[in-house]
């Protein structure tokens, strides 16, 4: 991977509320910002911006609420129309929580969607007119691949593309970037079998390269009123490939996931009494 410093270039673009030509907008925005894509660059595109370009915007008032959604919405203090959409969009719903936010009780469902564990199946109500919600792109990996192909056709450059989104790390406050989809380079670098500095063979380490690049891009793209749904990440050192990627290239079975596997097992087997507070009479450093 790269040893030279990374460069991250923010690219502002027009605010969109309905379906539009994403490829033309990207090219026009690059020109307006004086930014140039180079071969080997990675273009980060907000998954929400891509979804809006596909018309993936829903008026909540148009969503018919099922009895199941109404029950869950009441239990977790959620908008019933939003709850219905979550149930329709999620690949799996693990459960939900409610908590107080500035004196208001609010709730969320924890879901699995497109290989990502996230609240409310990734549905986004920010930076969109009130009463509307933005879904994920209909098919994220082909969307990323199409952006890559269009940039190659229109600008003559071979690049990588990531669709960026935000997620929450378990037990941590604050959102971070995650790559919803990748095109043009392997999103995960397998380090298993390699030798570390002390001669130890790596047994389980696989580096989330696409996610790491996404985090860099999110630093300049922002989350609120920045109007920067695009970013160029330069000198990542990724090797470009033409393979069609899918969620299978980044996801793992739930039983292999340290979070899902452990928490699911923990519902049946409480190991807390077996966990020592001290080791050999001394606090563990």
Regions found by a protein language model. Give the residues of each.
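N-terminal and secondary-structure boundary signal
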Residues: 1-285
